Structure formats: structure tokens, C-alpha cells
Amino acid sequence: MVNLDSLSLRSPAKLNLFLHIVGRRTDGYHLLQSVFQLIDWCDTLHLKRISENVVRRINPIPGVAPEHDLVVRAANLLKDFCQFEGGVEINLQKEIPMGAGMGGGSSDAATTLIGLNALWSLNLSKETLCALGLKLGADVPFFIFGKNAFVEGVGEKMREISLETPDFLVIFPNRGIATASIFQDPELTRDHAQITIDGFLTSPLLYQSNDCQAVAMRIYPEVKQALDWITQAVPGSQPRMSGSGSSVFAVLDSKTDIAKLKNFLQNLPKGWVGRVVRGLNKNPAYNLISFLQIDL
């Protein structure tokens, strides 16, 4: 094990290539099927080991109390679980929009667990980190899992899936969406027929729908506006929403004029954010972990 004083790791976003709601548990949690694709739209997490027995966030998000800050919660959860004597300073550089349906907060929490497991020399397994991550949010275990996945249950059942890594056009229409506002809506489809992983791999083009999209479009008109922008920018594409929104995306093929597309992005409505991003096959946080020969 390498002894570290500090660590900087990238926290990637994800896209839901499709999202089906297939049922609901008695406790109210929804059962889903989805394919999660990692993308190279990343936050950067800086962790510095300190002797004080405290978790300190250097640049807290305005308006977010520490008890609601996922990276602080993740650090304290791990610290308490291992009864670790010592602390950390956390500096998070945000690039992934909040409330975008791309898992930015969950990814940051996962990277905090991954990074502190190394920084504090805890030697916890991925399975243990995933179990801890699930206490923070349904998407956190996916980012700890670290590979593209066919996801089921409430998000805790994952099977690695081999995906191509194309370019994507992603637009965030500057509208944060609270997941609860979508999943509590009475018009949300909750009985989508289940599919198999083989069914998806055989005919992926048949599975490009998001059951949350119709509800989001009705409540948040910016979602439809963003979908219309992508349709205009990439004619013939099949844009859809990621997660519970509000980000929308389209897969780009090799014929897409990327330079022209980037010019298009400069003319988005004020406050909107758009990027051309590349799909990933692995959480980049693990690239540094592997380089440092830290086992997980």
C-alpha cells in the first residue's frame, strides 16, 4: 500500500441509455431497469489528509448544509464505519450540473469513498464500499462499481456490460429537477415490461426510451425545449432525457460535424450548458488508483 498525503481524482457523470420503471416496492422505492454509460464530463475531487479528527469541506456549495452535502456525508460515513482517527480536507471542483440527471452528486460521493479508502489506507473491498454507498444514494454503488452496467432493482443490482464509446451531445437546460417530483407524480409509468440484458445487447436501438421523460416534459417545459434543440442540431437523432432530468442527449455517429456542432453550442439560450462528450468504459478515478498500485 502506497502512503499518501493527498489525492486528486476525477468523478465522471453518467447517461441512462434507457430507463424503464418496472414496479414499486412496498416501501415506496421504484424498481427500474437501465443501462448506465459513463462519460467524460467530470468533477475533480481533491483530498488532503490532515491530523485533526475532522472532515472539512474547503469550498462548500452555497445553500447546502453539511448534513446534506454528499461528499461530507460520504467521508463521515466511512470515517465512522472504520472508526478512523484522523481527518481530511475536501476541495471539490464542480463541472457536472446539479439536478441534471447525470449522477454528479452520486459520483462525487463514490469518488470520496474510493479516494479515502486509499488515502486512509483502509483496504476495504469494492463490495463493502458499494454497501456503504447505497446508504447515500441509489446511484452511488454504480460509480464505485466503476464500469458501464445493466442496472436493476433500485440501482443496487449491476452487471457489467460492454458498450461502444461514442461521442454524445449533452444539453443541460439550466433547470435542476428534484428526483422526487418525478417519481411521486401519479402519471409516471410504473409497469414497463421487463427486458433481459441479452435483449438489450441484441437490439439496443429498440431500447431508447425513458419513462420519466413524459412527466418531466409536462412539469418542466425546458426539457422539451432542449430536446427540440438537439433535434435541430442533429437531424435524425433520437434525443432523450437522462435519469429524472433535466439533461438530454443524443448519440453522435462518425458523420457528425463536431466543429459545426460546437458552433451550435455557442448559441444555446442563456444559462444553458452543452457539451460534446465521449463515452467511457471505466471510472477514471480507478486509473490513478491502479497506477498507484492500490488494490480494491
Swiss-Prot record:
Record-linked Gene3D superfamilies: 3.30.230.10, GHMP kinase, C-terminal domain (3.30.70.890)
Lineage per the UniProt record: Bacteria, Pseudomonadati, Pseudomonadota, Betaproteobacteria, Burkholderiales
SUPFAM superfamilies to which the protein is assigned, alphabetical: GHMP Kinase, C-terminal domain (SSF55060), Ribosomal protein S5 domain 2-like (SSF54211)
UniProt-recorded name of the protein: 4-diphosphocytidyl-2-C-methyl-D-erythritol kinase
GO biological process, one term: isopentenyl diphosphate biosynthetic process, methylerythritol 4-phosphate pathway
Entries under NCBIfam families matching the protein: ispE
Domain of life from the UniProt record: Bacteria
This protein's UniProt keywords: ATP-binding, Isoprene biosynthesis, Kinase, Nucleotide-binding, Transferase
Enzyme active site: K14, D139
Residues that hold ATP according to the record: P97, M98, G99, A100, G101, M102, G103, G104, G105, S106, S107
Function: Catalyzes the phosphorylation of the position 2 hydroxy group of 4-diphosphocytidyl-2C-methyl-D-erythritol.
Disulfide bond positions: none
Gene: ispE
UniProt GO molecular function: 4-(cytidine 5'-diphospho)-2-C-methyl-D-erythritol kinase activity; ATP binding
Catalytic activity: 4-CDP-2-C-methyl-D-erythritol + ATP = 4-CDP-2-C-methyl-D-erythritol 2-phosphate + ADP + H(+)
Pathway annotation from the record: Isoprenoid biosynthesis; isopentenyl diphosphate biosynthesis via DXP pathway; isopentenyl diphosphate from 1-deoxy-D-xylulose 5-phosphate: step 3/6
Family: Belongs to the GHMP kinase family. IspE subfamily.
EC number annotated for this UniProt entry: 2.7.1.148
